């Protein structure tokens, strides 16, 4: 419904990732660790940095089937520049109407422990999504875990 509503408003969204197996998460995390090791970080440092960008196996919200990564046909790279697209702005403004929250907001990185992900949305239901988004909270704050 959210993708259809965005399209009606002239914004084309594209599902990049939804449910992800633990095996796929392990593959993505290992690749991210190797990327950081190539910059000169130790194994432990690379693992800590990688975990800010890719959830370690067994910890990804994608395992639950409640998280989605949405991009556009013209901006398929999941990077911070995505936040400047009309699609990201539309999703942030309208996601709660469909039960989703922007899961990792830019101003909550110290709380979530995850880098800003303007493409990552988590389903929590309409009531909770509206409460979270209207108050400018992240999920940890809303659940009282911070």
Language model: regions and residue ranges:
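Cell-envelope/glycan interface and biosynthesis
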Residues: 1-146
């Amino acid at each position: 419904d959210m993708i259809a509503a965005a399209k009606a408003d002239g914004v084309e969204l594209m599902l990049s990732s939804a449910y992800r197996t633990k095996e796929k998460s392990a593959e993505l995390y290992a690749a991210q660790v190797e990327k950081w090791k190539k910059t000169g970080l130790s194994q432990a440092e690379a693992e800590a940095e990688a975990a800010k960008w890719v959830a370690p196996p067994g910890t990804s919200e994608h395992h639950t089937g409640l998280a989605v990564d949405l991009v556009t046909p013209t901006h398929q790279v999941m990077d911070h520049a995505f936040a400047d697209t009309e699609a990201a702005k539309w999703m942030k403004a309208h996601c709660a109407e469909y039960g989703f929250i922007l899961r990792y907001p830019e101003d909550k990185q110290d709380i979530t422990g995850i880098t800003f992900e303007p493409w990552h949305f988590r389903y929590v239901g309409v009531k909770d999504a509206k409460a979270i988004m209207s108050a400018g909270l992240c999920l940890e704050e809303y659940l009282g875990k911070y």
